[in-house]
Amino acid sequence: MTQQAAEVAKRRTFAIISHPDAGKTTITEKLLLMGKAIAVAGTVKSRKSDRHATSDWMEMEKQRGISITTSVMQFPYREHMINLLDTPGHEDFSEDTYRTLTAVDSALMVLDGGKGVEPRTIALMDVCRLRDTPIVSFINKLDRDIRDPIELLDEIEAVLKIKAAPITWPIGCYRDFKGVYHLAGDYIIVYTPGHGHERTETKIIEKLDSAEARAHLGDEYERFIEQLELVQGACHEFNQQEFLDGQLTPVFFGTALGNFGVDHVLDAVVDWAPLPLARVANERSVAPQEEKFSGFIFKIQANMDPKHRDRIAFMRICSGKYEKGMKMRHVRTGKDVRIGDALTFFSSEREQLEEAYAGDIIGLHNHGTIQIGDTFTEGEALGFTGIPHFAPELFRRVRLKDPLKSKQLRQGLQQLAEEGATQVFFPERSNDIILGAVGVLQFDVVASRLKEEYKVECSYEPITVWSARWIECSDKKKLEEFSNKAVENLALDGGGHLTYLAPTRVNLALMEERWPDVKFRATREHH
């Protein structure tokens, strides 16, 4: 095996998906702890004392002007190199969150045991399904009251349309939480709470029918055996191929806050999740073991500190090896660039990088020339697919405070749209400008950046748009007919693509029924 193939085989690149408050930040900290990437896991404080549920070193990053370690973290674990991509949680939920999922090979879904499957989780799972991403599931918060575990598995299957195969099964919960039983291994992992940075030694009881197991479960023993028989009769068994095909998810139980069960999940990622996969480009499929370098941009992070104008473009390496100072071809512009200052996100520091391999994520300094979806190679003209725009879910009409600045406004919005900060639509029948976003915070970010960078002040007005759909139709005559009939609701997006702005869900359903030859797409590739 070449050194490069060996490096690729070590890589595991995954993202965490969850609804806000399911415990994602705590899990991220505990995962870093496993990789010894942070010596002390800062406990997440209550909302009142600390609006941002982040550990202290992330806070330092904010003061330095760019919160970048919260996006990508690389750490070693069991002789593997783990790349963990965070998907923003609360108010900073945006299209970036969806796009991050195009750069990973697997995902960890975190569910709150008391709440089950929640709306944000459903939206993120829909995106994972576009690429049949393998999903590992962690049902969190067993140190509190949770819903019936069988009910939770049923809900995963019914709502997320994926088979659920329990790997561990909880013994009690809240004050009675005694640990988990490993179904295939026939052993109990005993729960001893370990908060903060304590790595408690794991105690294992072999064999469920042992005297020690009976003593540990006490009065609960018979009831647990009955429940287990029910589970084994009703639930799916783990099948690695179905997992890799995105059809089945292995389910683990634990409590991130109590530092219990997180290592089981990380072991599953190392043992079962795929190493970096081949990526499809328009021209051909690119294997990670290929010698020549290639990668694509899936996210651009603007700096929230106006003093620093640097923006970081996040690149997923698809093949070859990055070496400091190497020359790359920026395929869209046709220009060759020398990259001497790419960033890696090892543990808690932004570091200058010497080398990186397929599966790794690196950061390029971007002075406005790089767009989402751009491909970089060692000369070959490749364009990777599967980095889409997603239909926005929130819309606002933009109003200019100074009408003489409409040119700057258009220019600013065009730039911000290319960067993925927002989507912009120009209705065919009016001079309005409509912004689309996935999270409310995106509108605030756009307004503040227009003011800082383009000296344009704007305000927003509500508008009756329920969703946007990109229009495709191979029959020119039908398309013309449709365009004439639907002109009131048609717009061009920032890239000049025809878009239907549906005022209501019912309206969209009617239009789709009425125009079977017209395709109403909820995603559009970056070109």
From Swiss-Prot:
Cited SUPFAM superfamilies: EF-G C-terminal domain-like, P-loop containing nucleoside triphosphate hydrolases, Translation proteins
Role according to the record: Increases the formation of ribosomal termination complexes and stimulates activities of RF-1 and RF-2. It binds guanine nucleotides and has strong preference for UGA stop codons. It may interact directly with the ribosome. The stimulation of RF-1 and RF-2 is significantly reduced by GTP and GDP, but not by GMP.
Subcellular location: Cytoplasm
Classification via InterPro entries: EF-G-like_DII (IPR053905), EFG_III/V (IPR035647), G_TR_CS (IPR031157), P-loop_NTPase (IPR027417), PrfC (IPR004548), RF3_C (IPR032090), RF3_dom_3_sf (IPR038467), RF3_GTP-bd (IPR041732)
A single MF term (Gene Ontology): translation release factor activity, codon specific
Matching Gene3D superfamilies: P-loop containing nucleotide triphosphate hydrolases, Peptide chain release factor 3, domain III
Alphabetical list of Pfam families matching this protein: EF-G_D2, GTP_EFTU, RF3_C
Binding site for GTP: 18-25, 86-90, 140-143
Domain tr-type G: 9-277
Protein biosynthesis as UniProt keyword: yes
Gene Ontology BP, a term: regulation of translational termination
UniProt KW keywords: Cytoplasm, GTP-binding, Nucleotide-binding, Protein biosynthesis
Protein name: Peptide chain release factor 3
Gene name tied to this protein: prfC
Gene Ontology CC terms, in alphabetical order: cytosol
Family: Belongs to the TRAFAC class translation factor GTPase superfamily. Classic translation factor GTPase family. PrfC subfamily.
KW Cytoplasm (keyword) present: yes
UniProt feature coiled coil, ranges: none
